[in-house]
A protein has these predicted regions:
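Flexible, solvent-exposed loop/hinge segments and secondary-structure transition points
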Residues: 23-163
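Bacterial N-terminal signal peptides
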Residues: 8-19
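N-terminal secretory signal peptides that target proteins for export/translocation
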Residues: 1-4
């Protein structure tokens, strides 16, 4: 009987040790919620309306998966896919999509072969506590205006997440 108790205690102790050790290895990851995505898109939409811009606004998570898409009135339909591509590019490559547009413009056409890359200005990573947690893509106006609107949305991330 004492032998059995000892075995049970040893097994319980080992189980506890393993579970604590495994828990210590799991990283904590901040994620972009739909509520925060709505607030980020609202900031970008306000900027677009202030400029009189007709654009598509896309917010994706850190894997480039769609969280939210808004197509403002009178925005061309083609901007939907372009906006998704810009946002996805900024998220999965963790840098503005303009980086790839600049590479192509400068003759580095190999950037066109990158899987999932849309080398067009207007995609901006959403950074929170030093980590890319998603991205925003804007399409419909000039490349610079698209990026400027996206930057306003991305800059609102900390406030959107905190509230």
């Amino acid at each position: 009987m004492a032998q059995m108790r000892r075995i049970v205690l040893i097994v319980a102790a080992l189980s506890l040790y393993v579970s604590i050790a495994m828990k210590a290895e799991l990283p904590v990851k901040k994620v972009l919620t739909l509520d925060a995505a709505k607030k980020i898109a609202a900031a970008a939409e306000a900027e677009a309306k202030k400029r009189g811009a007709t654009v598509v606004i896309v917010v994706v998570d850190d894997g480039g998966h769609l969280l939210l898409l808004e197509r403002l009135d009178d925005t061309q339909v083609a901007s939907v896919e372009v906006g998704i591509g810009k946002a996805r590019t900024a998220a999965i490559f963790r840098r503005p999509s303009k980086v790839f547009e600049d590479q192509v413009r400068d003759g580095r056409v190999a950037a066109l072969a990158l899987p999932g890359a849309t080398p067009l200005q207007g995609g901006v990573p959403i950074v929170y506590e030093g980590k890319v947690i998603g991205a925003i893509g804007v399409s419909g106006n000039t490349p610079q205006e698209d990026e400027d609107i996206a930057k306003v949305g991305a800059a609102s991330a900390a406030a959107a997440i905190a509230n």
